[in-house]
A protein has these predicted regions:
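Short Cys/His-rich metal-coordination motifs, predominantly Zn2+-binding knuckles/fingers
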Residues: 65, 82, 96-100
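Short acidic, Pro/Gly- and aromatic-enriched capping/linker segments at domain boundaries
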Residues: 60-79, 370-379
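N-terminal accessory alpha/beta regions
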Residues: 45-68
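Catalytic center-proximal scaffold of phosphoryl-transfer enzymes
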Residues: 1-49, 93-488
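Extended assembly-interface regions of large multimeric machines
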Residues: 59-60, 83-86
Length: 488
């Protein structure tokens, strides 16, 4: 190993020498740091190719391999690493028993079939794509290499970003009296489709914790809070059963059921949200106040009726609420009749009538969710799902007139939730890569080769970089002059 690194260092020593010379001639230290970066990147690329070559030789020389696999030819692979783009050759083998063709060295090194980008680089571009466009995500990750937006997109889509949920031991499960489940959706423009596609989001938590210190409350515009034990699901979830199965499974794996007293499902009252009541025993639906206010504002055209409606709802009076809505409907109908008699266009009023009739139906259908605010007022902490929708989905997917494919909506929604749940992108890529079961004989070969590599390749790693270690080299004298002020 020593001789390999020494040889590579000598090959690229010129880069480091030029950087030092620039500093001696008056350039600032950035010239040197840039040269050091280029130097280490060149070493990294060549070192990788050399190690692959030596591993390949060990595979070729392995006596047991010779009985099981026939060497067919050499194959070149171009590979993008953190140091830049490199290339290396390794042998292509044929399984004598099955006839299957395989790069054994790739298998040993954990390089997947057809893989052209190192997994660490993949994790970086995917992590960037979580927050910015695919095109921007491929820039500046690898020295002198720009990874295309299409390549970034493919790497996001080829992985399943659903968080793996592991059941906790009973003694480790969260003991909580109340669980809050906020459910909402974002409307995202889909390519080649009229209208928008819905991406659903579920946020599960056990309460809110104030982050703003009490002594600063009067000085800030908004008090900052965070959700306790927060976990997020997101995706298309076209099948509502799949959505609620995931939620129920997470609760079963994470929470101690003996301590749970209340489970509140909060949202706008859509059927798929209320479906959760059938999946989670003793759960209660709570209409979120954002959507309640939105429907109350449908009466903005009539301040008198709107104030009456607000008062009736604040008093949790369903009869008065229905009567006020009936009054609003009758007033509009009367206006329509009068305008028709005068020969005026009534389309605007007819649209308003439809809207107010729908609003009345909404209040009637969601009344139990409205009353829940009164019945459980000591246990509710308020619904903040609109903020969760914006933070998880809208920021990346529905602002600035972005357009997505259906697959892209699903994958990015899952990825955004995955990272917010603390998921490790690199670890996930490795898990997916190693999930495929390998043949026993390849695993045995890998163990043998790694033992030999440790002994034959690693060895001593002491390395001398010529420019820095020559006892009386050119740079030695230049640096000496600089120290004593002879050279400027």
């Amino acid at each position: 190993m020593y001789s390999i690194i020494q040889k590579i260092c000598e090959k690229h020593n010129k880069i480091l020498k030029e950087g030092l010379e620039k500093v001696l001639k008056g350039a600032d230290i950035s010239s040197l740091t840039s040269a050091i970066a280029d130097f280490t990147n060149e070493i990294g690329k060549d070192l990788l190719a050399e190690i692959v070559k030596q591993i390949d030789e060990l595979v070729f020389e392995d006596s047991k391999r010779q009985k099981e696999y026939e060497s067919v030819r050499f194959g070149e692979r171009k590979y993008i690493t953190q140091n830049g783009k490199t290339k290396f050759e390794r042998r292509y083998y044929e399984d004598k028993e099955t006839g299957e063709h395989i790069y054994l060295t790739d298998k040993i090194l954990g390089i997947d079939k057809g893989e052209r980008i190192d997994k660490k680089v993949k994790s970086e571009i995917i992590s960037r794509a979580n927050d910015q466009s695919y095109k921007k995500s491929g820039k500046g990750v690898v020295p002198n290499v720009e990874i295309s937006g299409t390549t970034v997109m493919r790497n996001v889509r080829k992985n399943d970003w659903k968080m793996e949920i592991e059941e906790k031991k009973e003694e480790d499960k969260i003991k909580a009296k109340t669980i809050y489940i906020q459910v909402d959706e974002d409307h995202i423009k889909q390519r080649k489709k009229k209208g928008c596609t819905i991406s659903k989001i579920v946020t599960i938590y056990t309460g809110k914790r104030q982050l703003t210190r009490p002594e600063k409350e009067e000085k800030v515009v908004q008090i900052r809070r965070e959700l306790v034990n927060k976990f997020t699901f997101s995706g298309l979830y076209k099948d509502n059963q799949e959505l609620w199965e995931d939620v129920v499974y997470y609760i079963d794996c994470t929470y101690n059921k003996e301590t749970i007293e209340n489970i509140f499902i909060m949202g706008d009252g859509a059927n798929y949200i209320k479906e959760g009541l059938n999946w989670i025993p003793n759960s209660v639906f709570v209409l979120d106040l954002f959507h309640l206010e939105k429907y109350i504002n449908h009466l903005n055209y009539d301040e008198e009726l709107k104030k009456k409606l607000q008062l009736a709802i604040e008093q949790y009076d369903p009869i008065s609420t229905e009567n006020i809505m009936n009054e609003a409907i009758e007033r509009i109908k009367k206006e329509i009749t009068e305008d028709k008699q005068l020969g005026r266009d009534t389309k605007r009023l007819e649209n308003r009538l439809k809207k107010i009739e729908d609003t009345k139906t909404y209040f009637i259908n969601q009344w139990s969710g409205i009353e829940a605010h009164d019945k459980y007022k000591d246990k509710l902490t308020g619904c903040c799902q609109e903020g969760q929708v914006h933070h998880t989905l809208s920021e990346r997917m529905s602002t600035d007139a972005k357009v997505w494919s259906e697959e892209g909506i699903d994958e990015m929604s899952q990825l955004r939730a995955f990272t917010q749940n603390g998921g490790d992108v690199y670890a996930k890529i490795i898990d997916i890569s190693t999930a495929e079961k390998r043949e026993k004989k390849i695993e045995e070969l890998e163990k043998r080769i790694k033992r030999k590599a440790k002994r034959k390749i690693l060895g001593t790693t002491g390395v001398k970089i010529p420019s820095l270690t020559e006892a009386r080299g050119e740079l030695y004298y230049e640096l000496k002059k600089m120290w004593y002020g002879i050279a400027i």
